[in-house]
Amino acid sequence: MRLNTLSPAEGAKHNAKRLGRGIGSGLGKTSGRGHKGQKARTGGGVRRGFEGGQMPLYRRLPKFGFTSMKSAVTAEVRLNDLAKVEGNIITLDTLKAANVLTKDIRFAKVILAGEVKTAVTIRGLGVTKGAKVAIEAAGGSIEE
């Protein structure tokens, strides 16, 4: 293999649209923009949601609710992720050390997904009812 023999894979490159290159090209004269009008002009076009001056739908409907910022720092932990932690005591810090959670997470809840094989102690984490039953069935415990 030499540099001068390298080429893109078959079908990987497409020919660019060549606009305004005569009638025979199929994209001559108006270059596929039609005749006159706002959309035919350079920089022409209307913003998303614009309805020609009519009050747009997103302004006709009332505002409601908000997005809780707590959701950005909260995570779910699956039961099978608990096996990735060294030792049998599981806290927020041990989950971060095992790369189960990212460093910006401040709240976590263990959910019933997968299975837990070893007896573990959960400290300072939320636990769902199903996950609690599964952890205690494996010989583990939950501490607040």
Swiss-Prot record:
Q: How does it assemble?
A: Part of the 50S ribosomal subunit.
Query: What gene makes this protein?
Result: rplO
Entry protein name: Large ribosomal subunit protein uL15
For the region Disordered, what residue ranges are annotated?
1-53
Family as reported in the entry's similarity comment: Belongs to the universal ribosomal protein uL15 family.
Keyword Ribonucleoprotein: yes or no?
A: yes
Q: Which InterPro entries match?
A: Ribosomal_uL15, Ribosomal_uL15/eL18, Ribosomal_uL15/eL18_sf, Ribosomal_uL15_bac-type, Ribosomal_uL15_CS
Q: Name one GO cellular component term.
A: cytosolic large ribosomal subunit
- A Gene Ontology biological process term: translation
Q: Which GO terms describe its molecular function?
A: rRNA binding; structural constituent of ribosome
Q: Which UniProt keywords apply?
A: Ribonucleoprotein, Ribosomal protein, RNA-binding, rRNA-binding
Q: What is the native source organism of this protein?
A: Histophilus somni (strain 2336) (Haemophilus somnus)
The UniProt entry, under NCBIfam families, shows:
rplO_bact
The cross-references to PROSITE patterns, in alphabetical order and at most eight, read: RIBOSOMAL_L15 (PS00475)
Q: Where is the composition biased (Gly residues)?
A: 21-31
Recorded hits in Pfam families, A to Z, give: Ribosomal_L27A
- What functional role does this protein have? Binds to the 23S rRNA.
